A protein has these predicted regions:
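PRPP-associated nucleotide enzymes
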Residues: 1-158
Length: 158
């Protein structure tokens, strides 16, 4: 373990198991739709989580990426959101699952949900590996949550 890391919150095995459970949940929820889902990762933090999750989804599954920032130069959300890279895919009429690594203040995700809903997807849900409930400033309905975690700066997955 790195000298600057205080403790391990979740083991590799716990994370693998929970990602498999989330993938099974998504598979179950969309099993009757032949088009499956499009996973959208918020770069860069969620890219590894999304790739691991996609391997656990037993349906047609496309992946796309956005880069969105509300952190500026710090580690706390500034509330000012910028799209740095938009989607390559069209999402109109499609089932969208946004994959986040850490759901923190919810401000960035609120902006992202509003932006993507305007593109008329068939459905839109959110999955997050980690949710910091104590920091939430915006109410986000998260269909698939990996773990609740403390309101601390977190590193280590991906």
């Amino acid at each position: 373990m790195h000298e600057n890391i205080d403790r391990i919150l979740f083991t590799e095995d716990e994370i693998k198991q929970r990602v498999a459970e989330i993938g099974a949940g998504i598979t179950q929820d969309y099993k009757d739709d032949p088009d499956g889902v499009i996973l959208i990762s918020v770069l860069r933090g969620a890219a590894i989580f999304m790739a691991d999750l996609a391997r656990q989804i037993q349906l047609p599954c496309e992946m796309d990426y956005m880069a969105v920032s509300s952190y500026g130069n710090g580690v706390k959300s500034s509330g000012v959101v910028r799209i740095l890279k938009d989607l390559s895919s069209q999402i109109e009429g499609r089932n969208v699952v946004i994959a986040e690594d850490v759901l923190d203040s919810g401000l960035t995700l609120t902006y992202l949900l509003k932006t993507l809903k305007a593109r008329n997807p068939k459905s839109i849900e959110v999955t997050t590996l980690l949710r910091k409930k104590t920091r939430a400033q915006a109410k986000i309905d998260c269909a698939y949550v990996g773990f609740e975690c403390p309101d601390e700066f977190i590193v280590g997955y991906g």
